[in-house]
């Protein structure tokens, strides 16, 4: 487990250094784009991977085996005059204590991953300074990945990284960019975008959810390697927090992103539970996430 650290010392300006935090595999799918220079996508993929994996985003020490494993799939929908309109899926995970299992932390889809890029453009990040929308989005997601990872190891441990995301949102809202690039940063644009997610995560109203997120991982999953029954019971005990948050704000984005990452895992955990656990968990999940009924039905199979 990573050592506890003081929040005031967590962040630093991203710089090229050793002990980087992220190990991200990037895939770019340009199948929908015909008759274009396909080499540009290979160059872009390499540049994004180097940007995410070579920059040091915090002042914490990460051993090689502690790097956060993640993947990014970018599907190019439109490309013209160095403007790319894409959909991006980001997944991150972390190991569960005492097992070979890795648990998903993020399974996030950004449907407005839009940016301007010319082949061989250098991707540089300067904190609190807007350079390009691409570098801003990538930095936002690096901090989002680290924030979720830290929240899973320490109560509210991701706060400074979510605050870094918020700073990027604020910077981008006032930056000059193409209208298609603005999508995702603006409060009125959608209740399911980059702005909405980080606004939820830093909202005092969702502190109970973030405490549950920690307990789910450290006191639930990590406990299950030694005592499956106790770990599962601890997760079941905390799940009503999701229902409470959903009922207070049905349009809450963060609860949806949690279930996007955890729905299958919850099924795997509770289909081996007691009859009481199965019923309570199934009823709760169907109450807040009925669109995934087919998935949750497997709890009772």
Residue ranges with predicted function:
Residues 157-251:
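Flexible, glycine-rich surface segments
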């Amino acid at each position: 487990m990573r050592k506890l650290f003081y929040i005031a010392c967590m962040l630093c300006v991203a710089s090229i250094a050793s002990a980087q935090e992220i190990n991200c595999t990037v895939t770019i799918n340009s199948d929908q784009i015909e008759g274009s220079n396909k080499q540009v996508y290979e160059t872009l993929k390499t540049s994004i991977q180097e940007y995410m994996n070579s920059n040091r985003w915090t002042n914490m020490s990460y051993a090689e085996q502690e790097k956060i494993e993640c993947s990014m799939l970018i599907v190019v929908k439109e490309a013209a005059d160095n403007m790319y309109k894409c959909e991006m899926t980001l997944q991150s995970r972390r190991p569960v204590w005492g097992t070979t299992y890795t648990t998903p932390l993020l399974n996030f889809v950004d449907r407005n991953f839009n940016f301007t890029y010319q082949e061989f453009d250098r991707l540089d990040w300067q904190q609190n300074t807007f350079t390009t929308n691409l570098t801003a989005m990538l930095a936002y997601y690096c901090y989002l990945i680290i924030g979720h990872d830290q929240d899973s190891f320490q109560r509210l441990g991701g706060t400074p990284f979510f605050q870094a995301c918020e700073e990027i949102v604020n910077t981008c809202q006032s930056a000059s960019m193409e209208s298609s690039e603005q999508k995702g940063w603006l409060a009125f644009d959608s209740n399911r975008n980059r702005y909405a997610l980080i606004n939820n995560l830093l909202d005092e109203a969702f502190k109970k959810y973030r405490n549950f997120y920690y307990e789910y991982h450290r006191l639930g999953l990590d406990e299950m390697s030694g005592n499956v029954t106790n770990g599962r019971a601890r997760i079941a005990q905390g799940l009503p927090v999701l229902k409470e948050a959903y009922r207070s704000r049905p349009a809450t984005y963060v609860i949806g992103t949690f279930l996007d990452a955890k729905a299958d895992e919850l099924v795997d955990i509770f289909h081996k539970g007691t009859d009481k656990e199965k019923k309570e968990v199934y009823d709760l999940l169907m109450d807040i996430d009925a669109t995934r009924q087919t998935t949750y039905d497997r709890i009772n199979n």
